[in-house]
Amino acid sequence: MPDATIRDVARRANVSVASVSRALNGLENVSEKTRKRVAEAARELGYVPHAGARSLSLARTHAVGVVLPDLHGEFFSEIVRGMDREAGRHGYLLLLSTLHPEHGTTVLGALRGRVDGLIVMAPHLDAVDLAAALPRALPALLINTRGISGGHPAIHIGNAAGVQAVMDHLIGLGRRRLVHIAGPADNIDAQERAEAFRKAAQAANCEFEIVAGDFSEESGEAAVTDLMTRGVMFDAIFGANDNMAIGALQALRAAGVRVPDDVAIAGFDDIPLARHVSLTTVRVRIAELGERAIARLIGGLESKEFDDREETHEPELIVRSTTRLES
């Protein structure tokens, strides 16, 4: 007996092929009566939608789409690890993708019908563009994105509080000539961290300089090498993430600069590598952030009740040997 097709389901349910497609993909413009009739016909015929096996009664995939700005690096490895762990507890799978600049936001629409909900981390996207690209019928939770309308639940890292904590620490150590290695100019996290650094340095009447980086280790190393070449004097460096702080640490050690005696260094995130090099940093609890995002989205999917609260994931200062002088 040949496999059932979508046309067979349409004939059995006495609806159009388009109605079957909309019903099984969970779109809004289908009555509940039609949705149930289509699901029953699909079950009787043993029809499996092309996007893969799914719970036909509710057109559920038990999969969550996770869209990140990148999949490279320890931050993203950690956040995905937390998401995968929490999704597994609830019997869900993850479908991962990235927002490549050359492809725009097309990946968001491409996941419709393949997942029950989306988690989107797009700190570089304009709010209007992101709001327009999110599929209307697909529940979505946003992580560290610019504020958008539409009532989507969101989780934000408390960047300002984290930066204030590390600045209080550095200034409390007597450091007065401060450097901040900033992240990409179009990244909301980088912007918030740079602005918090500027405000804290100005409030304490410290000399400071903000230099450009791109969140990579190489950019942190290059930034510090350039500062030393230009003869800029500094006694503390705060990297907008751990990778750049670690790059800065490598540049200083290569130049024979003593850390933390001559220059103190701190980062942001607390990736696993930060512990190995004993880097003072702002701990985000990255895996826990991923777990919380999944738990909140799946909780809404299961209860069918979504709230639009913007939740703040508060970081904490972790002091290690790159700022702590041994007594």
Identify the residue ranges that each predicted region occupies.
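N-terminal helix-turn-helix DNA-binding module of bacterial transcription factors
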Residues: 1-61, 324-327
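Residue-level detector of anion-binding/catalytic polar loops
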Residues: 16, 48, 88-93, 139, ...
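Short, well-structured alpha-helical segments in soluble
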Residues: 104-114, 221-232
